[in-house]
UniProtKB/Swiss-Prot annotation:
Gene Ontology, cellular component aspect: plasma membrane
Name of the protein in its database record: 2-keto-3-deoxygluconate permease
Cysteine-cysteine disulfides: none
GO molecular function, one term: 2-keto-3-deoxygluconate:proton symporter activity
Membrane topology listed for this record: Multi-pass membrane protein
Length: 331
């Protein structure tokens, strides 16, 4: 049976399929982990330790000796995305209550959901698209996008926008596994090769564990809003990214479009941040559902929009540009 190949036909399938399976299990039998205990409970409820190992491996995979062109391109996209998310957070904080919107079409929407969806780029999706529509340097620009992985950037945005306060050691704790992996990977290339191979392997496991924090009834309540959020992520972050890529990065804007997605790892951020700062617990469940929906929407739409943009503004023959399904959302 071609189970893996079938799953990979779905955009981000290696994370989203286990996530949906976990959500189904949590909705129909929420006490499964407690009932079985042991290793079964660990797989069901181990989101944080699994993500910690994944974050370590992400750090180990980054090569400090990347070329200047790659670093300029990558830095431009990463800083632009973070800056846009910060501006949006500042603006939304003026209108959205601390515990999120409770009624109407926007019920469940919170600043936590918006920032989590906007401040990270799907590095795997970006790299795949740039392999097809960009240059080698543009493809390699995903190197710094790994720095966005995990809750650190979201915490910094929420903190600097005055929406939350975190103790300094919480920031250190959020990034320490990444830094240790980064150091080891650059001290020994064999360790980099060894640990980087584990990055895609861990994705289904934290997807399943994360799914077990989601109740499908919440997703049903926020489904259409999640689609709207996904489209908003593409528009609100995509336009500044295109401009930054053309003006600062020296590209034609295609890389900016390809970087306008929501990262699969962002789905975990609301829950992790709520564990660090309990004031976010009331909105964590709905934020997780909204971010998951926006990840799916952007994973489907961004490849199509990137192909159309490259066809019109790129430096490649139009006949060679057809939207292709992209199989993963690694970062």
């Amino acid at each position: 049976m071609k189970i893996k190949a079938t799953i990979e036909r779905i955009p981000g399938g290696m994370m989203l399929v286990p996530l949906v399976l976990g959500a189904i299990l949590n909705t129909l039998a929420p006490n499964t982990g407690a009932y079985f205990g042991g290793f079964t409970k660990g797989m069901i409820s181990g989101t944080v330790p699994i993500l910690a190992v994944w974050f370590f491996c992400i750090g180990a995979s980054i090569n400090l000796r990347a070329t200047g062109t790659v670093l300029r391109k990558s830095g431009t996209l990463v800083l632009t995305k973070i800056a846009v998310a910060w501006v949006v957070a500042m603006g939304c904080a003026m209108f959205i209550p601390e515990n999120g919107i409770q009624t109407g079409f926007f019920a469940g929407l919170s600043v936590l959901a918006i920032v989590s969806a906007m401040d990270m780029t799907n590095g795997g999706l970006y790299a795949s698209l740039m392999n097809q529509y960009g240059t080698k340097e543009e493809s390699g620009a995903f190197v710094l996008m790994s720095l966005e992985s995990g809750p650190l950037v979201t915490m910094l945005i929420l903190g600097s926008a005055g929406l939350a306060s975190f103790e300094p050691h919480h920031f250190v704790g959020a990034v320490l596994p990444f830094l240790i992996g980064f150091a080891l990977g650059n001290l020994d290339t064999d360790l980099r090769d060894f640990f980087s191979k584990a990055t895609p392997v861990l994705i289904p496991f934290f997807g399943f564990a994360l799914g077990n924090t989601i109740n499908l009834n919440v997703i049903m309540d926020t489904g259409l809003l999640g689609i709207v959020l996904g489209v908003a992520v593409i528009i609100i972050t995509g336009i500044p990214l295109i401009i930054a890529d053309r003006v600062i990065g020296g590209g034609n804007g295609t890389a900016g479009v390809a970087a306008s997605s929501a990262a699969g790892a962002a789905v975990a951020n609301p829950m992790i941040i709520a564990q660090i700062n309990p004031s976010f617990e009331p909105v964590a469940a709905s934020a997780t559902a909204l971010v998951a929906a926006s990840v799916i929407v952007t994973a489907i739409l961004v490849p199509i929009i990137t192909a159309l943009y490259a066809k019109r503004y790129g430096n490649i023959p139009k006949a060679d540009v057809e939207p292709q399904p992209v199989e993963s959302l690694h970062h």
